């Protein structure tokens, strides 16, 4: 049996109105992946005579978006010759940041859309920085709206230089910068004849070359629990996605912070593992599984617990401990000061955390310290802070286990900040 094509998750980022939705629309339109209900509507309206108009489709997508029905552009799939690609999100969704961090959807690559008319804008920088903070290591740049600058090579080069500077400063290397017009269909799926001066890949060709995501099988086992079920004849079945490591039948695993909270090890031997209703001897990173553990009951564990081997258990941060983190403030109405206690979302857990110290304010582009011990931090700032959880939780330093080292900070129904754990300080 031929090896299945690798699955790759991508996010679209970039400044508002630079053409993210149109680019996604064009990708789907030219690969014949427009949602069924839209095509049906088009045919019902007797619009057959007209050539199937891209503009009409984009209007429908936009209408549905404005009515609050996201045509799930989130989780839209299409194929390239060597990849299955899922567009897991596009900003503009309120929970974009939270989804990127806590979702079952860690993005493997980002497509940064920059309008040739405007060049790099504030959100271009913010989104690029966010992609970096969230550990998206592969980026593709689409310089859009080339039709609006008459397909001018000089203008493309100016914008390409701006973006390249920004991305190199953030540590990105080897990224394609592609001149496109999503509206006209140039260099998205079909090669453009209007820019003979460009001989690089189209957007879809660049997507086809996204490196296959590596499975972190050599890292310690971590399975954040999403739900816990009781199944007749089997017993308690925790369900979750293997983030790192390998789980085998017969392994002895422990759950945290459950063990810390109950002051006794919640642990046992793995009796069975199931995926898509089939039993399997082992599970690898990316697998969504249910598994049964001898001696672990339904009331012992819950969503937000993390399973690991007893030989290398998940790291617990208790209220007497603190952790140092680097954050970027995305959206706070006033300013964050010491004592602020919002809710931290990481993997499948949510715990209120208190800002204990503001150690330094950073230049978001270079990471250099611009101010020690600031009195406050506000929207747009990047900072090193010390946080203390109000109850025990599992979180890991991002250098060791990036999958469990990133978090979102939420308050008043919005994502206030995104960050990553630098180190953990154990209290006495």
From Swiss-Prot:
It comes from the Archaea. One of its GO terms (cellular component) is cytoplasm. Coiled coil: none annotated. One of its GO terms (molecular function) is GTPase activity. Gene3D superfamilies: P-loop containing nucleotide triphosphate hydrolases, Translation factors. Its EC number is 3.6.5.3. Keywords: Cytoplasm, Elongation factor, GTP-binding, Hydrolase, Magnesium, Metal-binding, Nucleotide-binding, Protein biosynthesis. Residues 68-72 are annotated as: G2. InterPro entries: EFTu-like_2, G_TR_CS, GTP-eEF1A_C, P-loop_NTPase, Small_GTP-bd, T_Tr_GTP-bd_dom, TRAFAC_GTPase_members, Transl_B-barrel_sf. Residues 89-92 are annotated as: G3. PROSITE patterns: G_TR_1, G_TR_2. Residues 14-21 are annotated as: G1. GTP binds at residues 14-21, 89-93, 144-147. Belongs to the TRAFAC class translation factor GTPase superfamily. Classic translation factor GTPase family. EF-Tu/EF-1A subfamily. This is Elongation factor 1-alpha. It comes from Thermococcus sibiricus (strain DSM 12597 / MM 739).
């Amino acid at each position: 049996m031929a090896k299945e094509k690798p699955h790759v998750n991508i996010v679209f980022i970039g400044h508002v109105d630079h053409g993210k939705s149109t680019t996604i629309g064009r990708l789907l339109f030219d690969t014949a992946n427009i949602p069924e209900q839209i095509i049906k509507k088009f045919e019902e309206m007797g619009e057959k005579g007209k050539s199937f108009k891209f503009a009409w489709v984009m209007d429908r997508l936009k209408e549905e978006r404005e009515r609050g029905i996201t045509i799930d552009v989130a989780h839209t799939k299409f194929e390239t010759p060597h990849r299955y690609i899922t567009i897991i999100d596009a900003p503009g969704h309120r929970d974009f940041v939270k989804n990127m961090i806590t979702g079952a959807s860690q993005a493997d690559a980002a497509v940064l859309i920059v309008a040739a008319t405007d060049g790099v804008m504030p959100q271009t920088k913010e989104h690029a920085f966010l992609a970096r903070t969230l550990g998206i290591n592969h980026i593709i740049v689409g310089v859009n709206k080339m039709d609006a600058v008459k397909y001018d090579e000089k203008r493309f080069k100016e914008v390409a230089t701006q973006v390249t500077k920004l991305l190199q400063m953030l540590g990105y290397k080897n990224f394609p910068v592609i001149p496109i017009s999503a509206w006209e269909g140039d260099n998205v799926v079909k090669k453009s004849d209007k820019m003979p001066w460009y001989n690089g890949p189209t957007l879809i060709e660049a997507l086809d070359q996204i490196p296959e995501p590596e499975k972190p099988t050599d890292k310690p086992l971590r399975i954040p629990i999403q739900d816990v079920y009781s199944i007749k004849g089997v017993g308690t079945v925790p369900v979750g996605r293997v983030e790192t490591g390998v789980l085998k039948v017969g392994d002895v695993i422990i759950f945290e912070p459950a063990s810390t909270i109950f002051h006794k090890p919640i642990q046992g031997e793995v009796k069975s593992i199931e995926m898509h209703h089939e039993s399997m001897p082992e599970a690898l990173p990316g697998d969504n599984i249910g598994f049964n553990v001898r001696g672990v009951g339904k009331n012992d564990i819950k969503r937000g617990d993390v399973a690991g081997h007893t030989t290398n258990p998940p790291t617990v941060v208790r209220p007497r401990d603190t952790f140092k983190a680097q954050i970027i403030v995305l959206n706070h109405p006033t300013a964050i000061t010491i004592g602020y206690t919002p809710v931290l979302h990481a993997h499948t857990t949510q715990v209120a955390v208190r800002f204990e110290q503001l150690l330094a304010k950073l230049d978001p582009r270079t990471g250099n310290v611009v101010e020690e011990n600031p009195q406050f931090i506000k929207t747009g700032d990047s900072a090193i802070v010390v946080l203390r959880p109000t109850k025990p939780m599992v979180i890991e330093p991002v250098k060791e286990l990036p999958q469990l080292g990133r978090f979102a900070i939420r308050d008043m129904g919005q994502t206030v900040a995104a960050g990553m754990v630098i180190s953990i300080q154990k209290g006495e």
